[in-house]
Each structure stands twice: as structure tokens, then as C-alpha cells.
């Protein structure tokens, strides 16, 4: 009896598979011309399994044994469980380690405060190197006959001269401030209240010191003429142009 049932079940399974395949092929032909809303109704009627086989060719039997990677909850409100198929990360953080941050000792508070005077004294040799470089450029300029190379050397020499003037100007300002601070410090020691100069007053003192230096070198008149021309050109830019009236 059991053998007969098993034989009958074995006989039925191939025919069922064939009927399913025939039904799928038949559905494929018909579904290509059906609107989406009707397809959705059809999916509700025949079930998602046969619908997916017909439309997308997805074999649901192949994917039944593969669990989802997302966490699942038991129906009895148990704890979440992870699938054994989930890939383990390559680098697992067992112990949280504090991220190392780069540290520049030049700008770190642990290295102390910046001493400008000490810095300039320590790197005073850089100015000597600049002087030697300027001399070598001037020598090269005298020897060179190539027009393009001479132009490049002239441009480089102008930049060097401009940088040198800027350094000297900054140095003169530092010296002026230093003298004012020393004078004020001496007066405070004698009992005077501390007095701090405004920026405008400090600028006037720096300008007076600059005029004094230029006068000693005989360049004051040239500097004043150049400054007047520069001021006049600035004023000219703000003057409105004269309108031409057609006669």
C-alpha cells in the first residue's frame, strides 16, 4: 500500500512540474500585453511565486535556504539574532583606541611662547644667504646676453629688492616700537602712569623716523615727489569725467 502511494506520488511529481512550466510559459505570453494594474490583480490571484516565475524568471526555491542579512526577531518577542551567513568585518575593533592626532611642535603650547627677538637672532644667517643670492643674480645678469633670460633675471632682482625693502621697513617698525616701550617702561619705574600709544600716533612716529632716515641719505625729496604723484593719481580717479555735450 505504502509502495503504491510512493509510486503514485513519484508519478505525479514530474507531471506537476511539467504543468507548472507550461503554465509559466503561457503566462509569459499573455502578461506582456497586460497593463500594470491588471498585473497587480493577477499577482494577488495566482500568488507571488508563480507571478515572479512568469515575469522575472526568479526561482524562489533557490533562495529559500539563504537567510536575510538583516536582523530578525522571534515571534515570541525574543532577542534579535544575526544570520550565520553574514560576513565578518576584516578589522574588528575589540578595544576602542584613541585616535592619534598629528602634532606640530612649532605651534604647540608645550613648546613655550614665541620669542620674536630670539627667532630673528637664531635665523639671522638667512639674511646673509639672501644677500649672497642677490649678488649671484646681479653677476649672472651682467654676463647674460639672452633677452628672455635677462628679463627673467631682472624680474627676480626686482622681487628680491622689494622683499628686502619690506624686511627693512618691518625691522624699522619693530625698533621704533621697542624704543617706545623701553621709554615708557623707564617712565613707569619713575612713577608715571602707563600710557599706550594709539595706532595713528604710532604711525606718525614711524613716518617721522622714516623721513629722518631718508633725509640722512639724501633721498627725502625724491620720496616726497613720488608720494605726491601717487596721491594725485588717487584723487584723479575719484574726480568725475567731464561730459561732452553735442552742439
UniProtKB/Swiss-Prot annotation:
Instruction: List all membrane-crossing ranges.
Output: none
Any single biological process term in GO: maturation of SSU-rRNA from tricistronic rRNA transcript (SSU-rRNA, 5.8S rRNA, LSU-rRNA)
> Which residue stretches does the UniProt record annotate as biased composition, category Basic residues?
218-240
Residue ranges annotated as compositionally biased, kind Acidic residues, are 8-23
One matching Pfam family, short form? RRP36
Name the UniProt key words of this record, in alphabetical order. Answer: Nucleus, Ribosome biogenesis, rRNA processing
Ranges where the record places region Disordered: 1-29, 62-89, 136-188, 218-247
Listed GO cellular component terms? Answer: 90S preribosome; nucleolus
Q: What InterPro entries does this protein's entry cite?
A: RRP36 (IPR009292)
DNA-binding in keyword set: no
Q: What is its main location?
A: nucleus
The similarity comment for this entry is: Belongs to the RRP36 family.
Q: What is this protein called?
A: Ribosomal RNA processing protein 36 homolog
The record lists the organism as Nematostella vectensis
Amino acid at each position: 500500500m505504502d509502495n503504491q502511494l510512493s509510486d503514485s506520488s513519484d508519478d505525479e511529481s514530474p507531471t506537476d512540474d511539467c504543468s507548472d512550466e507550461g503554465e509559466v510559459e503561457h503566462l509569459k505570453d499573455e502578461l506582456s500585453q497586460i497593463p500594470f494594474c491588471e498585473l497587480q490583480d493577477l499577482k494577488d490571484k495566482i500568488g507571488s511565486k508563480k507571478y515572479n516565475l512568469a515575469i522575472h524568471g526568479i526561482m524562489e526555491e533557490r533562495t529559500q535556504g539563504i537567510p536575510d542579512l538583516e536582523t530578525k526577531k522571534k515571534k515570541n518577542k525574543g532577542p534579535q539574532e544575526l544570520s550565520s551567513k553574514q560576513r565578518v568585518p576584516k578589522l574588528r575593533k575589540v578595544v576602542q583606541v584613541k585616535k592619534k592626532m598629528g602634532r606640530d611642535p612649532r605651534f604647540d603650547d608645550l613648546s613655550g611662547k614665541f620669542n620674536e627677538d630670539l627667532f630673528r637672532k637664531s635665523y639671522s644667517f638667512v639674511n646673509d644667504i639672501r644677500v649672497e643670492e642677490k649678488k649671484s643674480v646681479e653677476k649672472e645678469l651682467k654676463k647674460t646676453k639672452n633677452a628672455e633670460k635677462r628679463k627673467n633675471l631682472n624680474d627676480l632682482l626686482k622681487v628680491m629688492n622689494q622683499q628686502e625693502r619690506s624686511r627693512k621697513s618691518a625691522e624699522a617698525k619693530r625698533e621704533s616700537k621697542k624704543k617706545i616701550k623701553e621709554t615708557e617702561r623707564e617712565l613707569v619705574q619713575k612713577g608715571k602712569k602707563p600710557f599706550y600709544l594709539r595706532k595713528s600716533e604710532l604711525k606718525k612716529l614711524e613716518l617721522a623716523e622714516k623721513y629722518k632716515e631718508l633725509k640722512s641719505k639724501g633721498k627725502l625729496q625724491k620720496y616726497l615727489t613720488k608720494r605726491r604723484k601717487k596721491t594725485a593719481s588717487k584723487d584723479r580717479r575719484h574726480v568725475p569725467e567731464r561730459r561732452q555735450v553735442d552742439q
